[in-house]
């Protein structure tokens, strides 16, 4: 209720100011940081093309006509997607525009088009059938716990709305965008983004969504800031307003004052200087100031390609999520289909190691063709529990991975959601069985290294035992932080409480690192912490020797690590472990960055505060 009151007050303030002919000043709206960066521009509010939820149920006695209408609408949407993909091709790598190929496959998939056609044949009109099929799929994805998979609901809803608009024969609108567009919508989608000239697009702001959404990934590739989950932003009142988008803080400021605008302009100028500075970073592996090698690994997904310079910085792939292969189909992929996908990934980075996480589904992360309903899916049947209960799924995937690795030898297998030693032992036994089977069949395969993903509190406490039987440990810092602090990081109301610098998180990380060191096995971390320069220095001090991150974070992390010695990293980590709050830890590390003249790697708000205190 308090949130609704606050929203109404802000909307009223904007409305009254507009009615009086006066501009409101410095109205702040909080969201979630989607893509770091700061910019200013003109808000352009984009409405969805049609509303599926408003479609009234109707039946038809001419199903063939409705089928023809549906197929025609489908064809028009496909043509638009191809056109948008072509327009973005000159600004994005092929792997990034490939998401539009994914959309096309979604439109052709039996789960969507097949079910719509089936309902039409049963007597429903095309709009009615489309409504029920799309809303059902959207509900399934929205129920998933995994942030990336949850975001696929937005993609499905957008495709459904576009098909509906064609079915209703609504004319495609031609929008006149300003030359400094801040694209704002309840759910900004990649297709909406693709409709705007990339030279004019300055930032995106979405009421829904998170940093894992496709549109945030595209914004990151285009180098534009994004704020997601700005739930209190009154869409009906801000179109045409001058706004600041702060992708560092996850904040939108409507009609900023001259004073605030001047402050942010300094941040914009600093960001440009930092970009030029990072472009000067030399090729080669990441090293601390005293020459200690820190392995920078890549979080690989369906999007993003590395430049030759970036490729020289990495030591391999720290996390490849195999869910993508399963989500792109209306059935379980065959062993041969999986082998082909895995082979491409392994060969791309060979001879560097590629860590492939086995299928992580179950509970709230069900596939459209493998639905699982539970009262408490967050703590239910998921991860390794599902694949051990369904060994046919696990065995097929392991067979595909090992066949793909034949002749390359750079495969590492990562097991998700391990909570007991028995789960690790059972998984390893199945992997050993596959090695023997494939060898007997004449395949040239070798036993891969098998690691455990530490992402739940129980795994932290049994890390020493897990480390004795695993070949490596890999911390999923996003989920571990969420579980330890009981904070949903995609919820804008509590997003500020999601803090990887919290002493409890750092002490858990230290325990994991020490367990790996005692067992003499590598310990990696994949998650947002690894890509944060301030956190990366702490992680090295805590003993982590592998940091896995998105390609966009490689340069800033390499720059930071090259300025601190191993001893300095350890000293900062020791201080952090004795701190009482995450805020205190962050301030202390940021202060060390300022002392090293790494000012531009410190978030602007924190940098300004510390510079005033140090003056």
Residue ranges and their predicted role:
Residues 1-348, 354-361, 386, 390, ...:
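Non-catalytic, soluble scaffold/interaction modules
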Residues 273-615:
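Conserved alpha/beta-domain cores
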């Amino acid at each position: 209720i308090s949130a609704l009151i606050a929203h109404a007050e802000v909307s009223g303030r904007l409305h009254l100011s507009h009615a009086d002919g006066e501009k409101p000043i410095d109205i702040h709206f909080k969201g979630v940081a989607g893509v770091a960066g700061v910019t200013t521009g003109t808000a352009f509010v984009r409405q969805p093309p049609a509303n599926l939820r408003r479609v009234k149920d109707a039946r038809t006695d001419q199903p063939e006509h409705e089928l023809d209408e549906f197929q025609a609408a489908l064809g028009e949407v496909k043509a638009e997607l191809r056109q948008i993909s072509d327009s973005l091709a000159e600004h994005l790598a092929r792997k990034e525009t490939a998401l539009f190929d994914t959309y096309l496959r979604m439109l052709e998939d039996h789960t969507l088009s097949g079910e719509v056609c089936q309902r039409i044949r049963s007597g429903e009109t095309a709009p009615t059938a489309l409504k029920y099929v799309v809303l059902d799929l959207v509900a399934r994805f929205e129920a998933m716990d995994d942030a990336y998979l949850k975001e696929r609901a937005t993609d499905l809803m957008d495709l459904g709305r576009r098909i509906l608009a064609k079915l209703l024969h609504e004319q495609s609108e031609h929008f006149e965008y300003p030359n400094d567009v801040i694209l704002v919508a309840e759910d900004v989608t990649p297709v909406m983004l693709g409709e705007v000239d990339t030279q004019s697009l300055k930032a995106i702001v979405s009421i829904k969504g998170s940093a894992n959404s496709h549109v945030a990934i595209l914004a990151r590739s285009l180098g534009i800031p994004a704020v997601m989950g700005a739930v209190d932003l009154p869409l009906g009142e801000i179109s045409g307003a001058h706004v600041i988008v702060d992708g560092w803080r996850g904040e939108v400021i409507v009609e900023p004052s001259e004073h605030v605008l001047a402050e942010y302009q300094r941040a914009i100028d600093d960001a440009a200087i930092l970009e030029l500075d990072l472009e000067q970073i030399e090729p080669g592996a990441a090293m601390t100031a005293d020459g200690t090698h820190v392995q920078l690994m890549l979080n690989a997904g369906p999007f993003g390609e590395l430049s030759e310079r970036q490729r020289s910085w990495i030591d391999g792939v720290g996390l490849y999520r195999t869910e993508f292969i399963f989500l792109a189909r209306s059935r379980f992929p065959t062993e041969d289909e999986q082998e082909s996908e895995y082979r491409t990934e392994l060969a791309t980075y060979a001879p560097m190691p590629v860590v492939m996480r086995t299928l992580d589904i179950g509970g709230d992360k069900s596939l459209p063709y493998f639905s699982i309903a539970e009262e408490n899916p967050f703590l239910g049947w998921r991860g390794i529990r599902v694949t051990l209960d369904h060994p046919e799924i696990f065995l097929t995937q392991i067979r595909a991975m090992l066949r793909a690795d034949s002749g390359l030898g750079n495969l590492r297998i990562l097991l998700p959601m391990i909570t007991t030693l028995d789960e690790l032992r059972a998984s390893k036994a199945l992997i050993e069985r596959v090695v023997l089977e494939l060898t007997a069949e004449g395949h040239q395969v070798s036993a891969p290294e098998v690691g455990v993903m530490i992402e739940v509190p129980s795994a932290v406490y049994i890390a020493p035992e897990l480390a004795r039987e695993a070949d490596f440990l890999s911390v999923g810092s996003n989920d571990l932080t969420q579980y330890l602090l009981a904070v949903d990081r995609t919820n804008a109301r509590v997003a500020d409480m999601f803090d990887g610098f919290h002493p409890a998180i750092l002490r858990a990380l230290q325990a994991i690192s020490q367990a790996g060191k005692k067992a003499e096995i590598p310990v990696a971390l994949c998650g947002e912490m690894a890509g944060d320069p301030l956190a990366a220095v702490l992680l090295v001090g805590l003993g982590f020797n592998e940091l896995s991150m998105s390609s966009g974070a490689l340069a800033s992390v390499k720059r930071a690590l090259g300025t601190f010695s191993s001893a300095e990293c350890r000293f900062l980590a020791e201080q952090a472990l004795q701190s009482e709050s995450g805020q205190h830890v962050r301030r202390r590390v940021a202060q060390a960055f300022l002392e090293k003249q790494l000012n531009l790697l410190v978030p602007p708000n924190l940098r300004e505060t510390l510079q005033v205190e140090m003056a």
